[in-house]
Amino acid sequence: MVENFEQDDFDMLDPAAKQVLAALSQYDRGLLVKVDLLHRKTGLMPEGMNDAVRHLEKSKLLAVLETPKRLGPYEIYAVEITDLGREVQAKFG
């Protein structure tokens, strides 16, 4: 999978998205991370967090828990790093 993701693809990621990916890679595989915990780990404000998560989800580097529940100003409730996200972070991060 990671062979389809190149250094240029990683370099094009927003710095906030890279920060979110790095923070998520510290958690065990299969663990959902609530957005408020991710905020504490990254220090990103809601707009930056929402943008980073949308970008990473489009790139298939993380999965968003589909739920109507939201935490405050965040558009999401919880996320999980994908296997591709782990591989990309390990290779390029």
Predicted regions and their residues:
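Short acidic, hydrophobic short linear motifs in intrinsically disordered regions
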Residues: 29-41
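Short, locally clustered residues in the helix-turn-helix/winged-helix DNA-binding domain
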Residues: 22-29
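Short amphipathic alpha-helical interaction segments
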Residues: 43-59, 76
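Short, amphipathic alpha-helical interaction segments positioned at domain boundaries
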Residues: 77-93
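Alpha-helix N-cap/helix-initiation sites
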Residues: 13-14, 31-32, 46, 50
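A short, conserved structural fragment
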Residues: 57-69
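Short, solvent-exposed loop/turn segments that connect beta-strands within catalytic domains
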Residues: 70-75
